[in-house]
């Protein structure tokens, strides 16, 4: 059996022979010997030429393969770089998108959580109110014992038996009619007539002059007794009254402010308030820290009856204010260029403290106003021969 190289050589010789025959046919003037010699020489040359061509082809192939390999390698590197950049860019955009989605979801959850908490607080307050109204314990029943005020009732009935706190009917001097009041008969000897109380925010204190004049709310819960009724109580003859402001913070801290010689001028003077000496641990917010804060000797103001001293406007925390009542969400108070006190402000829940909230600006903690949860204003008779 022939080897591949031998077969190739035989095939090459056959080709050379055929070519030689063709040349011999065209060139008849050459001799046979010359033809044979030429054929042999041509065969030898063809063989050398074939080898040379094979070498050149091999070199061209190797060079082409190297170029192709180099191009393929560069293309792979280029594609890898592009793919890597695309993955990094996609990862970053995906992270940013997910972060934004998570922030939006968290904000929505926080909002819904606050809404649920506020609704739960409202439901709890309403449930408590309904339950309280269903109960009718003896101390809350009006006692048909007409006295001038709660101090008078305490001094009269208390000499015979223990006087419970609750609803009583009083008929102060100067009043043409009797009316019902809540009497605190327990705190520091009792005999205190409650003229205002804030505990849960159920009663709306955003009222006009007529409501603050006659009073509103529930004497067993939140209420404002009324300017006319307060006037009749504190302007009786030969006596004076002490005003006691009881404050409770959201963390259940208690504080108070007390003023002797508390009285009001009549309706023609818009129930201008007068205060005596201060004592307590909550600070004197009625008089404030500056002259323009002083609410003593100021008339009462509401959103429709403006007596707050802002003529035509006053500056409050850098803000131009034309009406303190409007600034405080249309609540009524003895404003003086607004001032530091407003116990009739809007009752806020869950730690909120706004400019319209219940305010006693001199009661502070860590140099910040204390957030007030509940407050009551009580008056007690003081016998004072110098009172006019």
From Swiss-Prot:
PROSITE patterns: FIBRINOGEN_C_1, FIBRINOGEN_C_2. SUPFAM superfamilies: Fibrinogen C-terminal domain-like. Residues 141-383 form the Fibrinogen C-terminal domain. It holds the Pfam family Fibrinogen_C. Keywords: Coiled coil, Disulfide bond, Glycoprotein, Secreted, Signal. Glycans are attached at residues 53, 238, 329. Mainly expressed in adult heart. Residues 98-123 form a coiled coil. Residues 1-25 form the signal peptide. It is found in: Secreted. GO terms for cellular component: collagen-containing extracellular matrix; extracellular space. The keyword Transport does not apply. Disulfide bonds join 310-314, 324-338. This is Angiopoietin-related protein 5. It comes from Homo sapiens. The lineage of its organism: Eukaryota, Metazoa, Chordata, Craniata, Vertebrata.
């Amino acid at each position: 059996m022939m080897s591949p190289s031998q077969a190739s050589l035989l095939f090459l010789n056959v080709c050379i022979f055929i070519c030689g025959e063709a040349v011999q046919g065209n060139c008849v003037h050459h001799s046979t010997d010359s033809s044979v010699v030429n054929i042999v020489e041509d065969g030898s040359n063809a063989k050398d030429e074939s080898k040379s061509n094979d070498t050149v082809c091999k070199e061209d192939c190797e060079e082409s393969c190297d170029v192709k390999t180099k191009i393929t390698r560069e293309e792979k590197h280029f594609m890898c770089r592009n793919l890597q950049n695309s993955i990094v860019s996609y990862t970053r955009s995906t992270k940013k998108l997910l972060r934004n989605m998570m922030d939006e979801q968290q904000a929505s959850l926080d909002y819904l959580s606050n809404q649920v908490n506020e609704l739960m607080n409202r439901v709890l307050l309403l449930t408590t109110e309904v339950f309280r109204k269903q109960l009718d314990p003896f101390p809350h029943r009006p006692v048909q014992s007409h006295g001038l005020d709660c101090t008078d009732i305490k001094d009269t009935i208390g000499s015979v038996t223990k006087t419970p706190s609750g609803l009583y009917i009083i008929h102060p001097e100067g009043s043409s009619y009797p009316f019902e009041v809540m009497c605190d008969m327990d705190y520091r000897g009792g005999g205190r007539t409650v003229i205002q109380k804030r505990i849960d925010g159920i009663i709306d204190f955003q009222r006009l002059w007529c409501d603050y004049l006659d009073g509103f709310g529930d004497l067993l819960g939140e209420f404002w007794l009324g300017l006319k009724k307060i006037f009749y109580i504190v302007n009786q003859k030969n006596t004076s009254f002490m005003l006691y402001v009881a404050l409770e913070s959201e963390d259940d801290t208690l504080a108070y402010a007390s003023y002797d010689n508390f009285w009001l001028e009549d309706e023609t003077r818009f129930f201008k308030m007068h205060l005596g000496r201060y004592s307590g641990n909550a600070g004197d917010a009625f008089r404030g820290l500056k002259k323009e804060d002083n609410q003593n000797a100021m008339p009462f103001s509401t959103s429709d009856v403006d007596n707050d001293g802002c003529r035509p406007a006053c500056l409050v925390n850098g803000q131009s204010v034309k009406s303190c009542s409007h600034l405080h969400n249309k609540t009524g108070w003895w404003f003086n260029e607004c001032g530091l006190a407003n116990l009739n402000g809007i009752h806020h829940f869950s730690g909120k403290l706004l400019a319209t909230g219940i305010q006693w600006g001199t009661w502070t903690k860590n140099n910040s106003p204390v957030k007030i949860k509940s407050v009551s204003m009580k008056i007690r008779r003081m016998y004072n021969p110098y009172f006019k």
